[in-house]
Amino acid sequence: MLTQIYEIQTPEEAEVMIELGVEHIGSVILNADHCLQQALLDTVNTIRDSTSKSSMIPLFVDFEAICKVVDYYRPDILHFSDYFCDSSGILPVCEKHLELQSKVRDKYPELAVMRAIPVAQAGKGRFLPSLEAAKLFEPISDYFLLDTCIVADNSKAHNDQPSGEGFVGITGLPSDWATARSVVQQSRIPVILAGGLSPTNVQSAIHEVLPTGVDSCMQTNARDTNNKPIRFQKCMERTRQFVENARSA
């Protein structure tokens, strides 16, 4: 079972992930204006010297800025997490995201591309066109990441997700696993399950969804005094437990 851990922003954290045997080690770039960071470059270089793969999420959609990121860091995987559908269906903006991903793929054929496919939270899977979205992006993707998109009580998915307006993820909530399993079953590329996965639920998720791999971010982060996850601070013990439980599922 492949494991993927996100918000690894320093070489020291990357070294721990490598020691744990994490296959995909992910970093996040928050904005295009400060996209070239020496600490992140050192992190990617640390991963490059191991058997693990580096993955990067740019939280922006400017083609030139994304090219700067790829040229500077040379990651193994570029991860797109743009928001492109809601409960009404596939949004018109999806065409721009398909075009952007195709342009990046054409310019960097050696670069693996991961595409986040939004899945509503548990019990609301029918309100998002997750399977249709996967069919659209499969020809230009090497991996899918199934991540949670919050659908409100009125069954409307909104654009302002916790990861930032226009992007999917960072909810800390499990997705609808029945929908996720359907995406796995129809897909011809590896599918990684994300969305609220923790040491306590990862084995159940694996048995239910049967993904190629599992991803954790918020639920393996350190906690504040209110037991809320702290962004960009990993809890190494929770991460170790997550990896061990995923492998023994």
Question: Model-found features: residue ranges?
Answer:
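Glycine-rich beta-strand-to-loop/alpha-helix junction loops that act as flexible
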Residues: 57, 81, 192-197, 214-219
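N-terminal basic/disordered segments at the start of proteins
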Residues: 2-13
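A generic "structured core" feature
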Residues: 145, 153, 191, 212, ...
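Conserved anion-binding
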Residues: 26-33, 48-188
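C-terminal helical cap(s) of enzyme catalytic domains, especially alpha/beta-barrels
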Residues: 40-47, 88-104, 156-165, 169, ...
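A C-terminal functional module that forms or caps the active site or interfaces directly
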Residues: 192-210, 221-224
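Short amphipathic alpha-helices and their capping/turn segments at secondary-structure boundaries
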Residues: 12-19, 67, 128-140, 202-209
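Conserved, mostly hydrophobic/aromatic
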Residues: 17, 78, 144, 176, ...
